[in-house]
UniProtKB/Swiss-Prot annotation:
Undergoes morphogenesis-associated proteolysis which cleaves the 28 kDa to a 25-kDa product. Proteolytic cleavage of major core proteins P4a (OPG136), P4b (OPG129), and VP8 (OPG098), which occurs at a late stage of core formation, is required for production of infectious mature virions (MV). Its main location: virion. Belongs to the orthopoxvirus OPG098 family. Induction: Expressed in the late phase of the viral replicative cycle. It comes from Vaccinia virus (strain Copenhagen). It is found in: Virion; Host cytoplasm. This is Core protein VP8. It comes from the Viruses. InterPro entries: VP8_pox_nuc-bd. Coiled coil: none annotated.
Length: 251
């Protein structure tokens, strides 16, 4: 499936998450290119979570994790091949926490989407680009760990010439072109779906607690697109009202 999710954004690529300027950076991409992970809004920014590293991992925390995922109901239905079957809360959880998924990148409290650079286009230069298209049904999924998990960072001063597997049952704070995300490895063994939220046509969030509410929401898609500025406001609202994990990082 293309990294640009259908029914999630407009036809053109509207963002880029940095270019590959060095061979080492190319290796970093290769280190995660074959990883299996659930597609989400982060795929728009060409974020491919890595399953290997050439740095030593340093333990920085052992705690419970709460993180977020943005996607659309269409994306999940399409990836699950549901056809005319109804999308349920159980199906959403099974999609993200499929045992075949090696890694799941999560938005956390110090994930800053303003670091994203709008891609220049010869046809249009509108910086307030569309994130979720009119007619789509975007959702916000909140995940949390069942118990405390070790959180690591890469020691950039300990580079090796070879890549080694990061391993299972751990989390790694990673940065992709200025965007901090928390990668959780073997998420099916440590994570659970805590809540699902839909987007109202007033750019607010509403909790979807039952399959009936989920079905009702899917039958009332967005009447207007959600653009970058509105999305950034929604993300800040999420951070203020949902205690996402905060992991301070040094650039």
């Amino acid at each position: 499936m293309s990294l640009l999710l259908e029914n999630l954004i407009e036809e053109d690529t509207i963002f880029f998450a940095g270019s590959i300027s060095e061979y080492d950076d190319l290796q970093m991409v290769i280190a995660g290119a074959k990883s299996k992970f659930p597609r989400s809004m982060l795929s728009i920014f060409n974020i491919v979570p890595r399953t290997m590293s050439k740095y030593e991992l340093e333990l920085i925390h052992n705690e419970n994790i709460t993180g977020a995922m943005f996607t659309t109901m269409y994306n999940i239905r399409n990836n699950l091949g549901l056809g005319d079957d109804k999308l349920t809360i159980e199906a959403i959880e099974n999609y993200f926490l499929d045992p075949n998924n090696e890694v799941m990148p999560l938005i956390i409290n110090n994930t800053d989407m303003t670091a994203v650079i709008p891609k220049k286009s010869g046809r249009r230069k509108n910086k307030n680009m569309v994130i979720f298209r009119q007619g789509s049904s975007p959702i916000l999924c909140i995940f949390e760990t069942r118990k405390k998990i070790n959180i690591y960072k890469e020691n950039m001063e300990s580079a090796s010439t070879e890549y080694t597997p990061i391993g299972d049952n751990k989390a790694l704070i990673s940065k992709y072109a200025g965007i901090n995300v928390l990668n959780v490895y073997s998420p099916s063994t440590s994570m659970r779906l805590n809540a699902i939220y839909g987007f109202t046509n007033k750019n607010k969030l509403e909790k979807l607690s039952t399959n009936k509410e989920l079905e009702s929401y899917s039958s009332s898609p967005l009447q207007e697109p959600i653009r970058l500025n509105d999305f950034l406001g929604l993300l800040e609202c999420v951070k203020k009202n949902i205690p996402l994990t905060d992991i301070p990082t040094k650039d």
